């Protein structure tokens, strides 16, 4: 999967840009706030039909403008005349966005997810450690959805049923004795069906993903530290349908569903201790990088976006990361940095297959 060309109009601070890319390494250098991250976000948008940072589409349109457009020309690497395809999105204030493959609009955006596998590494990844379990579930969901479209369908159905059950709990919160048992059971039976699929897919993913993650961490840290990542779910210990019935009285009191796969967690450890508690900034950054680079290995050379990845890392880890991402194990890479030295070190390893852009106030000049 290669992004050959990208055209942008009125996306955030990028008023107009037409760029052609290298198959391997594409570097963007410039001060903070100039548009480097916005460029990566536009590429992300074409994979996931939304921004990585702001899901309110109208707020991603350049201020004072009424519409924005992102268009990418992709090489799917297939031995046919249709290997090159255009993916485009049009955003207009007050109007539903149009997402198109070639000349055909998608009826449902979910149909596009997984077509263009992509992994993004950004400073926002720190929320995987610092924030609640919903961030870690979102990580699992984001990876699995790229190779299993049924997973995303099950997840959407489960969340819709969860919303229904929570609304019903709220409705009878003050009069729990009047709660309609049969209606609850109808909803819960359907929730269990979707929850089991999600649970088994998450279990399978973590089992297959962890070796790649640990390999990447060892490469970054110099094999000096041991890390682990464990999937924790209530379904590992109990029958969910029985749990729904047993906890329904308590759920009616609190007004929300206390059991289910929406409570799943990832236990992130450095040695025998929680990463959040004992990990230094550099160790936490290395752990997150290993998760994302492991994801790239797991998905099989997706487009890889690396935004400001060297911050908070010592010189030795920076050197190991440069060697790692410059290797043949990764596909097309887009990387940003304010420090030209880091990018120069990468370019020295891949000089013939790299392009570099200077980014200034939303404009991109090839170097």
Residue ranges and their predicted role:
Residues 110-118, 122-189, 193, 362, ...:
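A conserved P-loop NTPase coupling/switch region
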Residues 72, 332-339:
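Structural recognition of the conserved hydrophobic beta-strand(s) that form the central parallel beta-sheet
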Residues 1-31, 175-304, 312, 316, ...:
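Conserved NTPase motor "head" modules and their coupling/switch loops across ABC/AAA+ ATPases, GTPases
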Residues 44-57, 294-301:
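Post-Walker A helix-loop "phosphate-sensing" segment adjacent to the P-loop in P-loop NTPases
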Residues 307:
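Active-site residues of response regulator receiver
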Residues 48-135, 144-147, 151, 210-214, ...:
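Nucleotide-state sensing region of NTPase/ATPase domains
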Residues 36:
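Conserved lysine of the Walker
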């Amino acid at each position: 999967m290669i992004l050959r060309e990208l055209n942008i109009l009125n996306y955030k601070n990028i008023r107009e840009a037409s760029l052609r890319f290298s198959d391997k390494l594409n570097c963007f250098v410039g001060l903070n706030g100039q548009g480097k991250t916005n460029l990566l976000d536009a590429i992300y948008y074409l994979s996931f039909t939304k921004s990585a940072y702001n899901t309110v589409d109208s707020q991603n349109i350049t201020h004072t403008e009424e519409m924005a457009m992102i268009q990418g020309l992709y090489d799917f690497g297939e031995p046919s005349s249709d290997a090159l395809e255009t993916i485009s999105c049009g955003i207009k204030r007050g109007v539903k966005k149009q997402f198109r493959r070639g000349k055909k609009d998608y009826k449902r955006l979910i149909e596009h997810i997984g077509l263009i596998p992509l992994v993004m590494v950004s400073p926002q990844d720190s929320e995987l450690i610092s924030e609640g379990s919903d961030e870690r579930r979102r990580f699992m969901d984001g990876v699995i959805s790229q190779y299993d479209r049924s997973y995303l369908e099950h997840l959407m159905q489960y969340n819709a049923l969860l919303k229904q059950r929570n609304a019903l709990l709220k409705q009878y919160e003050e009069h729990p004795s009047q709660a309609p048992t049969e209606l609850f059971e109808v909803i819960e039976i359907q929730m269990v069906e979707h929850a089991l699929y999600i649970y088994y897919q998450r279990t399978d993913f973590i089992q297959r993903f962890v070796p790649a993650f640990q390999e990447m961490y060892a490469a970054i840290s110099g094999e000096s530290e041991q890390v682990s990542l464990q999937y924790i779910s209530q379904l590992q210990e109990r029958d969910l349908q029985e749990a729904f019935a047993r906890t329904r009285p308590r759920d009616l009191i609190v007004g929300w569903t206390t059991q289910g796969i929406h409570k799943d967690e990832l236990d992130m450890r450095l040695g025998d201790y929680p990463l959040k508690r004992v990990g230094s900034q550099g160790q936490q950054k290395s752990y997150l990088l290993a998760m994302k680079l492991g994801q790239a290995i797991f998905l099989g050379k997706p487009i890889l976006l690396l935004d400001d990845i060297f911050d908070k890392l010592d010189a030795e880890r920076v050197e190991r990361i440069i060697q790692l991402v410059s290797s043949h194990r990764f596909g097309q890479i887009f990387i940003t940095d304010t420090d030209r030295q880091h990018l120069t070190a990468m370019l020295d390893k891949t000089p013939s297959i790299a392009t570099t852009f200077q980014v200034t106030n939303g404009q991109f000049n090839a170097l």
